[in-house]
Amino acid sequence: MALDDIHTPVLLERCLELLAPALQGEGAVLVDATLGMAGHSEAFLDALPGLRLVGLDRDPDALAIAGERLARFGDRVHLVHTVYDGIGRALDGLGIGEVQGVFFDLGVSSLQLDRVERGFSYSQDAPLDMRMDGTAGLTAAQVVAEYDELELRRIFYDYGEEKLAPRYASRIVQAREVEPITTSARLVEIIQQATPAAVQRAGHPAKRVFQALRIEVNQELSVLARAMPAAIDRLAVGGRVVVESYQSLEDRIVKRELRVRSTSTAPVGLPVELPEHRPELKLLVRGAELADQHEIAQNPRAASVRLRAAERARRRHA
């Protein structure tokens, strides 16, 4: 199967349009903090011959595929196995200080969803794993087995925004006392049995629970909350950050960080805005951009995307 059949980059042309003005110089550095199968990055490297890429990913399988895909670019590309809140350490390890661009394409990748054995999908039976890095960390099966009822309720509420969180947490605890819950099919069965018929008609009842477990297993929101400021701190003046998120919890973190950094810190009533009070960032899009119907028809994954972008206007202490 061709890579493009597995993963079509979301809003590719718009992302390139937003990043390109900051990446024109020879030797400009772009960090793709969520490299995946490198669909976006391959296009960026083709379009910008002087560009150097630092690609980060926690998934060794994705890094291997990306490495093959980008091999033709030679020493213009450096790949690092790390979670994206490790951006500072990754750049330090390469001897790179400031960068001209940072790109995030958040959420679970097509590769992870399509490989049944990874356990991300509620529509196919597989071991309950859900780790983006299959070499480290708790699995979803361990979370389901070891968290108490209140902890399960919390993650279903907080990370899945699931109204039936108490019911699902209770049923899971009851079921695991009979036998371990180790597969996605068994977890789906428990959730379906606990779901009122009227709710089942509104969509798959396991969707939010699986999202919550995935976020907990991979600590996605806490990682993002650390990664956003770390990435912005490495941007050179004139550098740009572009972020694609796919659910409201991620987008809320991105929106908050960009809003804070793009707001003047001048005290209310100060007659003159001093240079140190000027915003660090200038927003490049109004609110969050969504995909149009043409893009969604070509690439259904784009249906839930929210794109935000900003440019570094000044250094934090200048």
From Swiss-Prot:
It catalyses: cytidine(1402) in 16S rRNA + S-adenosyl-L-methionine = N(4)-methylcytidine(1402) in 16S rRNA + S-adenosyl-L-homocysteine + H(+). It is an enzyme of class 2 (transferase). One of its GO terms (molecular function) is rRNA (cytosine-N4-)-methyltransferase activity. It is found in: Cytoplasm. It comes from the Bacteria. GO terms for cellular component: cytoplasm. Its EC number is 2.1.1.199. GO terms for biological process: rRNA base methylation. S-adenosyl-L-methionine binds at residues 38-40, 57, 91, 105, 112. It holds the Pfam family Methyltransf_5. Keywords: Cytoplasm, Methyltransferase, rRNA processing, S-adenosyl-L-methionine, Transferase. Belongs to the methyltransferase superfamily. RsmH family. Specifically methylates the N4 position of cytidine in position 1402 (C1402) of 16S rRNA. This is Ribosomal RNA small subunit methyltransferase H. It comes from Clavibacter sepedonicus. The gene is rsmH.
